[in-house]
């Protein structure tokens, strides 16, 4: 049985921060699901279709549940994160992944979502350098290491 990966993203996400993990997970034989609030293809900051093909698996963030997936990827993009972090269902899903000790990969500005989910306390967290104060103020330990 294939492992399942969930990528939560939205309009104006950083294209490369979505595309790279999307295809790497497929190369590793994961079944990849993209969760977007509107449950439709959106455009990244540079105009890339997210997800790239109309037959890629896409679900609404209203329908996500940690129990259906093995790992979670959160691509960055400040404009996307500003909206996604207000989605209570997304924040609850992140908390559930954390409670079950499942892998969460947050890229660049997606550390905002980890802060909103209140899961950075006493943990080393890397991300975009502009979020250093936010990470530290949330009780995390900012690091510039991957």
Give residue spans per PLM region:
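Active-site-adjacent pocket-lining segments in enzyme domains
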Residues: 3-41, 53-146
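Acidic/histidine-rich helix-loop elements
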Residues: 44-52
């Amino acid at each position: 049985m294939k492992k399942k990966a969930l990528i939560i993203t939205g309009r104006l996400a950083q294209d490369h921060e979505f595309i790279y993990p999307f295809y790497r997970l497929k190369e590793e034989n994961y079944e990849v699901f993209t969760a977007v609030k509107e449950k439709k293809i959106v455009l990244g900051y540079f105009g890339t279709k997210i997800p790239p093909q109309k037959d890629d698996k896409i679900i609404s963030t209203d329908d996500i549940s940690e129990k259906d997936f093995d790992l979670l990827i959160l691509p960055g993009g400040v404009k996307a994160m500003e909206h996604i972090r207000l989605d209570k269902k997304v924040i609850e899903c992140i908390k559930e992944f954390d409670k079950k000790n499942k892998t969460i990969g947050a890229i660049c500005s997606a550390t905002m979502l980890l802060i909103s989910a209140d899961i950075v306390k006493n943990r080393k967290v890397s991300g975009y350098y502009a979020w250093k104060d936010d990470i530290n103020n949330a009780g995390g330990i900012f690091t510039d290491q991957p």
